[in-house]
């Protein structure tokens, strides 16, 4: 009986040792595959850090948008708006950020007329674009705003001498205007400019 008992005990222990050895060999394969999968995201993170490193190089310049108004325009008003260091209607531009850089360019200007005249009034306000600041008074009345209705005109860089950089000491362009109505208030101009600044001081 004891001999049979030993055989049955030994018979059971032998397959257990074999299964344990088989189980010990399996985790080795799993560990190798997990190491390979962990290395791939590390390479991607290094690539992301390189792209972020290029961001500070863009700090050499700045892009800004300014909105200002020219109020209390009479139906017979006339004048000019010079864009550059002479733009006194927008001190945040002329006396602010413009003094922090060596060069600038205005890439777009939007001229809007906000009517304040009654429907019984008549007349219009003509405007003209001077891309080289050579005109002192209006020379053409083709483009105009009726004083009883709102109007809008937009000019891109090619129309306002805005493709090249300008020294901050020189003006870029002008808008001249002249009305043919009465002396009563006709409305106001709402002006939006998109600017770029280069080479900080």
Curated annotation (Swiss-Prot):
Bias category Basic residues: which stretches?
9-23, 37-49
| Transcription listed as a keyword | no
The organism encoding this protein is Beet western yellows virus (isolate GB1) (BWYV)
Task: Spell out the residue ranges making up region: Disordered.
Answer: 1-63
Q: Where in the cell is it found?
A: Virion
Give the top-rank taxon of the lineage listed in the UniProt record for this protein. Viruses
Q: Looking at the keywords, is ATP-binding present?
A: no
Primary role: Major capsid protein that self-assembles to form an icosahedral capsid with a T=3 symmetry, about 23 nm in diameter, and consisting of 180 capsid proteins monomers. Most of the 180 monomers are the major capsid protein, but a small percentage contain the minor capsid protein, which has a long C-terminal extension.
Q: According to its UniProt record, which protein family does this protein belong to?
A: Belongs to the luteoviruses capsid protein family.
Looking at the UniProt record for this protein, which Gene Ontology cellular component terms does it annotate, in alphabetical order? viral capsid
Q: Where is the composition biased (Low complexity)?
A: 50-59
Q: Would you tell me the protein name for this molecule?
A: Major capsid protein
What UniProt keywords are attached to this protein's entry?
A: Capsid protein, Virion
Principal place where this protein is found?
A: virion
Question: GO: which molecular function terms?
Answer: structural molecule activity
Its UniProt domain note says: The N-terminus like those of many plant virus capsid proteins is highly basic. These regions may be involved in protein-RNA interaction.
């Amino acid at each position: 009986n004891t001999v049979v008992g030993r055989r049955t005990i030994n018979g059971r222990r032998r397959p257990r040792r074999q299964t344990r050895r088989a189980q010990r060999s399996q985790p080795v394969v799993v560990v190798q595959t997990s190491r390979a999968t962990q290395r791939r995201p590390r390479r991607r993170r290094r690539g992301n850090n390189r792209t972020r490193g290029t961001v500070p190089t863009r700090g050499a310049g700045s892009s800004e948008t300014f909105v200002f108004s020219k109020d209390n325009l009479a139906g017979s008003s006339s004048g000019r708006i010079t864009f550059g260091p002479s733009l006194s209607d927008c001190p945040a531009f002329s006396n602010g950020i413009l003094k922090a850089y060596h060069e600038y360019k205005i890439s777009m200007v939007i001229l809007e007329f906000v009517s304040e005249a009654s429907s019984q009034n008549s007349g219009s306000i003509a405007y003209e674009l001077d891309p080289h600041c050579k005109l002192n008074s209006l020379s053409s009345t083709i483009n105009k705003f009726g004083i009883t209705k709102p109007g809008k005109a937009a000019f891109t860089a090619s129309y306002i001498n805005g493709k090249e950089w300008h020294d901050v000491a020189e003006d870029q362009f002008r808008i001249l205007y002249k009305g043919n109505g009465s002396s009563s208030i006709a409305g106001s101009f709402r002006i939006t400019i998109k600017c770029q600044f280069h080479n900080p001081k």
